[in-house]
Structure formats: C-alpha cells, structure tokens
Amino acid sequence: MVDNAERMPFRDGELDVVTSTFLFHELPSRARQSVAREMLRVLKPGGLLVVLDSAQLVESTELRIFLENFAASMNEPFFASYLREPLERLFGAEGFSLRETATCFPSKLVVAAKPSG
C-alpha cells in the first residue's frame, strides 16, 4: 500500500501485522511519532509491528562516522535526528511492547507488539 502513514485508511484495530521498510529515517521526528501512534491504532491487540530501517547510533559506536557521513553525503535531511532517536524508545513511548531487535549492518530490525489488554 502507498498512502500517508500518518493517516492510514484502516479502522482501529483492523490489522494483524504492520510492516515498514526504510521509512522512519525519511521522516522528521514529529512525523515519526505520529506514524508510530498510527501504527498502534490500526493494529489489533496482540498485533505485530515489524520495522526494517537504517542502523542507529545505539547499535554501535564503531558505525558513528559512517552513519553521520551518510546523512551529509546522501542528502538525508532527517537522518541526523533519526540516528539519535532509537526506534525502540519511540515505539515504547507510543505503547508498543518490544519483542526483538537485531542489527543487520547497515540496517536494524525491530519487532514490537500492541499490548493485548
């Protein structure tokens, strides 16, 4: 589906799974919060969120120079703030329960669930 991730055309609790591939680093911080909130809204209780995106500074200090240079060299206006705002913290703040994280350089995978109750 291609649509506005901040206002998805689904009812509350309609979906079992929501996925995102390389979206969050393209968004300003405020939009990342809004999209995470919207993902929670459309998921059924116990539903899963699966996100694949660029690695962040929390994954490895060894990657810092590579990741910070990437933003400048690839004209990524929101990448610098994305690097410093861990997705795990974002999803937790919006109400998700973290299930799994994995680093697959230069990417990260985050799996979280909407609480059942």
Give the ranges of each region predicted by the language model:
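Conserved Rossmann-like nucleotide-binding pocket used by diverse enzymes
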Residues: 1, 19, 50
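Conserved SAM/SAH-binding loop
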Residues: 2-7, 106
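A short acidic, Gly/Pro-enriched loop at the edge of an enzyme's catalytic core
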Residues: 6-18
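A short SAM/SAH-binding and catalytic strip from SAM-dependent methyltransferases
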Residues: 16-30
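C-terminal alpha-helical "lid/dimerization" subdomain adjacent to the S-adenosyl-L-methionine
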Residues: 33, 48-109
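A short glycine-rich, Lys/Arg-flanked "PGG" loop and its adjoining helix->strand segment in the class I
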Residues: 33-45
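C-terminal lobe and adjacent flexible extensions of AdoMet/dcAdoMet transferase-like proteins
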Residues: 110-117
